[in-house]
């Protein structure tokens, strides 16, 4: 198990290793499932997690030191009081996504391909937990784990958050955007969603004000310029800048890098 400390004597527990808290292979039907079926899948995952922790806490085959350590922990008393102190919602890392005007891929993550119309940037590891468990030649094998470090931030294309023109003209999708499995594993982090959410909001305003609501007609360069100007003028010495100057400086360094990469990509076209 992977433990990450949190405030108020709490921790965030995550999967680690070949056999851990991930119920590998049991979520495949979730995207197309009915609400009733999703509830059944949720309960299966809940039973699996509870059972794993109970086994590690009580079974005498588990080393006493591990059992003693687990015995110190329990569900958070001040959270989800109407659901046994456990979240009623599964954490969905990845689900159905739009196929937009372009698809973000591994090549974009590694810098082999650079987009000319950035709407934001991403920089997290290409990350996927195992997706399946199989028996091969009498041996149990997990399949699908990906952990590939990304050296530099890369741009996310505006075309990846907007649908093809013949499908919709008033839709922008910053979360379930157009990306391959590998690329989405890098883009799907909350800080990246925050950047995309803000820039997509600005793009929506631009579409309404100047393009009769047609998102495909918006110039991503105009949006990114407004994004940079807005953050510089509205929060030049704000809370984040004063408490976390390194993070704030890195934020604008990434913004400048996004502009430079886009300029180079346009010149190469």
Predicted regions and their residues:
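Flavin (FAD/FMN)-binding glycine-rich loop and adjacent Rossmann-like elements that form
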Residues: 1-266
């Amino acid at each position: 198990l992977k433990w990450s400390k949190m405030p108020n004597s709490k921790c965030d527990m995550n999967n680690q290793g070949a056999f851990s808290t991930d119920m590998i292979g049991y979520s495949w039907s979730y995207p197309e499932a009915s609400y009733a079926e999703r509830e059944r899948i949720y309960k299966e995952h809940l039973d699996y997690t509870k059972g794993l922790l109970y086994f590690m806490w009580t079974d005498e085959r588990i080393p006493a030191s591990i059992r003693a350590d687990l015995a110190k922990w329990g569900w958070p008393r001040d959270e989800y009081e109407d659901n046994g102190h456990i979240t009623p919602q599964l954490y969905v890392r990845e689900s159905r996504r739009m196929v937009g005007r372009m698809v973000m891929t591994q090549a974009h993550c590694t810098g082999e391909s650079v987009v000319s119309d950035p709407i934001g940037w991403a920089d997290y590891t290409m990350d996927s937990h195992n997706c399946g468990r199989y028996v091969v030649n009498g041996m149990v094998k997990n399949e699908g784990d990906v952990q590939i470090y990304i050296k530099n931030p890369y741009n996310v294309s505006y075309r990846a958050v907007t649908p093809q023109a013949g499908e919709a003209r008033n839709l922008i999708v910053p979360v379930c955007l157009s990306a391959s499995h590998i690329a989405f594993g890098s883009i799907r982090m909350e800080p990246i969603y925050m950047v995309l959410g803000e820039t997509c909001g600005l793009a929506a305003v631009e579409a309404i004000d100047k393009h009769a609501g047609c998102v495909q007609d918006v110039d991503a360069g105009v949006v990114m310029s407004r994004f940079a100007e807005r953050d510089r003028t509205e929060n030049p010495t704000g809370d984040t800048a004063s408490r976390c100057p390194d993070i704030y400086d890195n934020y604008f360094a990434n913004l400048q890098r996004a502009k430079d990469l886009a300029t180079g990509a346009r010149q190469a076209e």
